[in-house]
């Protein structure tokens, strides 16, 4: 899987950086949100707890997808702005079990 950053912009009103990316996955299945998140964290040298992959849109029959991610400046802003279901899909299973 290869990820290319298409656009990166600051959003000072919401204290976050917004990233549009393209994901190429020739001969592989569509990547999961957590796989993309981990790759973006490594590429952007970001804190894994502050990066949220909002969506991944796949073209029919194409080995590529476009996506939208956000990097927040603080965990408080992330929980204040993002809906709970988006936070949940960006959390690994082991972290969810620890919270219960």
Swiss-Prot record:
Pfam families: Ribosomal_S24e
A GO molecular function held by the record: structural constituent of ribosome
Gene3D superfamilies listed in its UniProt record: 3.30.70.330
Keywords in alphabetical order: Ribonucleoprotein, Ribosomal protein
CC per GO annotation: ribonucleoprotein complex; ribosome
Domain of life: Archaea
Alphabetical list of InterPro entries matching this protein: Nucleotide-bd_a/b_plait_sf, Ribosomal_eS24, Ribosomal_eS24_CS, Ribosomal_uL23/eL15/eS24_sf
Gene Ontology biological-process entries: translation
Similarity comment: Belongs to the eukaryotic ribosomal protein eS24 family.
Xref: PANTHER family: 40S RIBOSOMAL PROTEIN S24 (PTHR10496)
HAMAP family per UniProt: Ribosomal_eS24
The protein, known as: Small ribosomal subunit protein eS24
Originating organism: Methanothermobacter thermautotrophicus (strain ATCC 29096 / DSM 1053 / JCM 10044 / NBRC 100330 / Delta H) (Methanobacterium thermoautotrophicum)
């Amino acid at each position: 899987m290869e990820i290319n950053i298409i656009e990166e912009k600051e959003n000072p009103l919401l204290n976050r950086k917004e990233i549009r990316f393209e994901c190429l996955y020739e001969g592989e299945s569509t990547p999961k949100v957590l796989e993309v998140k981990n790759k973006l964290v490594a590429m952007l040298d970001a804190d894994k707890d502050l990066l949220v992959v909002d969506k991944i849109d796949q073209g029919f029959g194409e080995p590529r997808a476009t996506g939208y991610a956000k990097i927040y400046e603080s965990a408080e802003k992330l929980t204040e702005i993002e809906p709970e279901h988006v936070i949940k899909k960006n959390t690994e299973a082991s972290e969810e079990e620890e919270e219960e």
